[in-house]
Amino acid sequence: MQLLKKRILQDGKCYEGGIRIPFIARWPGHVPAGTANDHICAFYDLMPTFCEIIGEKNYVKKYANKNKEVDYFDGISFAPTLLGKKKQKEHDFLYWEFNETNQIGVRMGDWKMVVKKGVPFLYNLATDIHEDNNVADQHPEIVEKMKTIIFAQHTPNPYFSVTLPEKK
């Protein structure tokens, strides 16, 4: 008898054990029972999804924080996926920052980079879901592309600081 070792995903905010969570929906007559999909979404996709479902087309203007000069709505509705439709817009990348662990995360397709205290670690989630093998040295072009995303997405904040990777 062969015993299978159950492996737990790494925890820590930007690792899969901290961000990979199932989304479960029940909506009789709309969401087909027993369906599953591999659509990747983020917390910030919830508002556009629910607004699309209720028919609110102008939610950015209606719900923007009036106390802010700029309020960001970066989410993409995943209502088409919930409703079983084929056309679903997807993110080019997902981006996270966690100041309490000094981590930044970027995901593009199967590639995921975690920057811990300024040091980049690159993983291919298609072959390494547990994020055991840092392949940053083997794929410097992907690391640089993801660093470009980090520098474009990061907004400095004195209350929530993270250490950015070195610029090339």
PLM region spans:
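C-terminal cap/loop subdomain of S1 sulfatases and analogous C-terminal strand-loop tails that border
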Residues: 1-16, 30-35, 39-125, 156-160
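Conserved nucleotide-sugar donor-binding catalytic segment
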Residues: 20
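Short glycine- and hydrophobic/aromatic-rich loop-to-beta-strand nucleating segment
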Residues: 23-25
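A broad, structural surface signal
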Residues: 48, 52, 144, 148-152
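Intrinsically disordered, low-complexity polar regions and short flexible loop motifs
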Residues: 128
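Active-site-proximal N-terminal segment of extracellular/periplasmic enzymes that hydrolyze or transfer
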Residues: 133-141
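Charge-dense polyanion-binding interfaces
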Residues: 147-164
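Carbohydrate-binding/catalytic loop surfaces
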Residues: 167-168
